[in-house]
Structure formats: C-alpha cells, structure tokens
Amino acid sequence: MGQKINPVGFRLGVTQEHRSRWFADPNRYPQLLQEDKKIRDYVRKNLSNAGIADIRVERKADQVELEIRTARPGVVVGRGGAGIDTLREGLQALLKDSSRQIRINVIEVERVDADAALLGEYIAQQLERRVAFRRCVRQAIQRAQRAGVQGIKIQVAGRLNGAEIARTEWTREGRVPLHTLRADIDYAYTTATTTYGILGIKVWVFRGEIIPGQEDAAPSNVGQPRRRNQQRRRQQFEDRSNEG
C-alpha cells in the first residue's frame, strides 16, 4: 500500500520525525491539536512570500516553541528581528493568551530545489500565472535534478490548461521507492487557484536511502561540483527573547 498512504506518516519513527512534539492530558488533546493547525495556517498565510517549507511545534509547560524552515529567512526575521516580534504578537492574539510565551526559531532550508513543499509551491505559482502545466512540471523536475535528488514524481489534477473535463496527469524521473522504509521520501500536497478552478499538486522527492548509523553523514553534492567552494553558511535565527 505504499502508493496509497502518506509517505511521511508511513515513515514516522523510522526516517521522519513528528511535526508536533508535545504531550498533554487526553482532555486537552483536541484543543492543542486545533491550536497547532491554527498556528500553521496563520504563519503560512502571513508569510506566504517567504517560502515556508515546514513548521514544527513543541510545547513545554506554558511555552510554545516554533521551528520554521524557510527558503527566505530574511523575510521571516525582518529588519532587526521586527518580523519575529510582529509574528509573535499576532500568534498571541490568535491564541487569545498574551501570557503564553512563544519562541520562534527560523532555519534556512539547505537545498531549496530538493524540498517537496517548495517545489509544489513553485508549480502552484506558475500555474496561477497561466503557464502551461507540462512546462511547469518539466522546469520543477529540472530544478530538482540539478539539486541532486535521486528521483522525483509530480502529479497535477484538475481542469488542466482550462480543459472542460478534469483529469489527472503525472510524471516521474528517476527512482521513487515508496515501499522502502529507509528511503528518504519527502512528500507535499498543495493547491493552485486558477480562473478555471482549483488544481491539486502532489510532489514526491527521493533524496536517497538512510542507512542506520549514517544519518549524520554529509549530503552528497551530486550535480553541484562547481559550487563546492561557494557554499555559503546556512542562516539560522534562534529566538532568545524570553530568556531571563
């Protein structure tokens, strides 16, 4: 059933980590789960131009800690950290609890074109600009291949190019072994709102196999020999505003 189940959920505890990490009383689980969804929706809506790849939530007592993985950390942080302050105030107003501490850590995505969520967002933006869907998919695959992925599969469904009858088309390059649990599969689903209706976009990215004991090995630089000496330091912002 590897082609039916969500590849990320299928690998939780094996090669993937939970997006929300906290424990709570069973009576409070529904409330906190809804809070997590509200937080993610708010961040994605207000930072739609920042290239948000993933949002992880941790809870410790009365503190909520967010880890935002983004392609453009400067947009999230803002000048002098003003963006972080504005985001924190907005989240406190959303949760209707100004006493709750919210820490926001921003991490830059290392390989933007090897991230399924960012590739899906790129395709959605192109489709909303009325670019032909086959051209969008081809460009996304080329970008992923240049980033050194071992395989990629993209599926687009809906009224493609404004056709009267909706249909589903997909294409794959390289290997995408959905049944192999040690395979590092990144998956994302997004939608594009066009004048003809909503198009659904699914992206699977195979970045290689994770062998036990080799998780911390450096990622391969396949397809990037020229940039070996031009690697810039990954940006990271750790929120220390609530530390005494």
Curated annotation (Swiss-Prot):
Residues 225-234 have a biased composition (Basic residues). GO terms for cellular component: cytosolic small ribosomal subunit. SMART domains: KH (SM00322). Residues 39-110 form the KH type-2 domain. Belongs to the universal ribosomal protein uS3 family. The gene is rpsC. One of its GO terms (molecular function) is structural constituent of ribosome. SUPFAM superfamilies: Prokaryotic type KH domain (KH-domain type II), Ribosomal protein S3 C-terminal domain. This is Small ribosomal subunit protein uS3.
